[in-house]
Amino acid sequence: MVPRDWWLEPWEKAAILEFHAGHLTEGYRRMAFMMLDADVVAASPSSVYRVLRDAGSIKAHKTRPSKKGTGFQQPLAAHRHWHVDISYINVAGTFFYLCSLLDGYSRFIVHWELRESMTEAEVETIIQRARERFAGERPRIISDNGPQFIAKDFKDFIRICEMTHVRTSSYYPQSNGKIERWHKTLKGECIRVKTPLSREDARRLITEFVAHYNEVRLHGAIGYVAPADRLAGRDREILAERDRKLDAARQRRKAAREASRPAG
């Protein structure tokens, strides 16, 4: 069998397995781009998958394609859509309200607050603080039909701020799935894992997780770049650099195999 340029060398396979051992909670796709960005191994997600599968470190499985957001017109730039949602956070048996705002284009967490109550006026305050962080932006606010968002005062607030507001259908909430997914990720990877013992502890943990989520964690829905990079417009440069690294690795493997062939 003739070796292909994308076939990994033994040291590359070993490096993948070693990296995986230190990142067991990461999926193979995210891990492939993490290694690529960190100059550990330049390998495609499919190559990483095969290495892990052959080593018995991953199981083949089929996932059903999600219909979340099907038919929903996605924003083409940052700060066009801000998704807002309220979720409950269980802290040592006491439930607090978490309100988050997420930029629909970059998945960047624009602002969040953890409170004992969450009235319509408090939601206004949270959105206003988010607007102060990004002065001059007038995003479309996307929410569910919670009581805070259907109140007349909230409608007046949106009008005064010269924004627009869209509420998801009661029978089709998928267009707000981005923020719902964020809350699910936060609870699954932070709150339930680290079990905060007080509201102050929860705020500290959420602050740390949001920083990691925005600045470091690679997001699959935006090409496995960090939300902050997408927000700042650095994603194209990152993707181009990855392509360059993958091509250079293929050329290096090809040259190494040609050099190892017996002279004839």
Protein language model annotation of sequence segments:
Residues 1-81, 173, 231-235, 240:
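Basic, flexible linker segments flanking DNA-binding modules
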Residues 2, 161, 185-264:
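C-terminal domain-tail junction helix/linker
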Residues 6-7, 143-145, 151-158, 165-188, ...:
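RNase H-like two-metal-ion nuclease catalytic core shared by retroviral integrases
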Residues 11, 41-42, 46, 50-102, ...:
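Mobile-element integrase/transposase regions
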Residues 16, 31, 48, 85, ...:
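Mobile genetic element proteins and their domesticated derivatives, centered on retroelements
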Residues 20, 35, 39, 169, ...:
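Short amphipathic alpha-helical interaction patches enriched in hydrophobic/aromatic residues
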Residues 36, 50-53, 159, 211, ...:
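Residue-level detection of the helix-turn-helix DNA-binding "recognition helix"
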Residues 112-113:
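Short hydrophobic alpha-helix segments
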